[in-house]
Amino acid sequence: MKFLFVVDPIKNINPLKDSSAALMQASSKKKIEVWICTPQDLEARGDEVWASSWRAEVCPWVSFKENKCIPLAEFNCIWMRKDPPVNEGYLYATHLLEVAERKGVKVINKPSSLRAWNEKLGALRYSHLMAPTIVASKVKDLINFAQINHDVVVKPLGGKGGQGVIRLTKDSPGIKAMIELITSQEQLPVMMQKFIPEVKEGDKRIIIVNGEPIGSINRIPQGGDFRSNLAMGGKAEKTNLTAKEKKICTELSQHFKDEGLFFVGIDVINEMLSEINVTSPTGLREIETLSNKSVSDKVIEKLLEII
């Protein structure tokens, strides 16, 4: 059995922190051949897509064994694990992967759903589970929302890991200029949400695999920052799901399965949905460290049940 992981350049992956590394190692333990490429290594020849890929040994970490150009149809599963931004290169890669999908290859996550589910906008499908939210580019609309809700968080729609996220109040000096800047002079929409003060107690990342929540961590902001993202210095703590959080997972899970979203990370603050991460969800390493359980092994086992 062969798995292909479409990832960022391997030198950018920290094997001690990265969920892609955890999934590669779990695959290898199951005697699955692990092959690695970047989106730039994909090419179409007629109706066949190929990958200039490297076969890798990944225990404890990557050592490359051979480089071959292989038709994607030869792989049992392809993991699209390229980190955001979801730019033109990313989108084109999903179209190429879709060719392989039509030939019967399992692609995680489904390419068309990767295109359809912006990680900020996707959550709007479940707005009743969220804090008050607006997505807009007009300064007057965003300022009006801030005045109504007093304390807000502004998120660029294409960001990741807390990058570019700012907090404003209705009385923030220069609020108009700041919104003009983040919307590129009203050319780009942004998400603005009512600030949830309980974020100081944590922002939960919940990993959902084939519709089942299999692990979670609570991320605590550090050093006076309101952002709890691990990439921004947030501290991971062990956690359990509340009854309401389990209900949120249940409501979302069947939709994820229907959309071919096998591996998803959702973020929940004070029992309210914040974001839905489908491109390259993280958190496996931290969950495993805190729970002393190999969650990555369970991910691969659940995948093998459906391919």
UniProtKB/Swiss-Prot annotation:
This is Glutathione synthetase. Gene3D superfamilies: 3.40.50.20, ATP-grasp fold, A domain (3.30.1490.20), ATP-grasp fold, B domain (3.30.470.20). It comes from Prochlorococcus marinus subsp. pastoris (strain CCMP1986 / NIES-2087 / MED4). It catalyses: gamma-L-glutamyl-L-cysteine + glycine + ATP = glutathione + ADP + phosphate + H(+). It comes from the Bacteria. The gene is gshB. Belongs to the prokaryotic GSH synthase family. ATP binds at residues 146-202. One of its GO terms (cellular component) is cytoplasm. Residues 120-304 form the ATP-grasp domain.
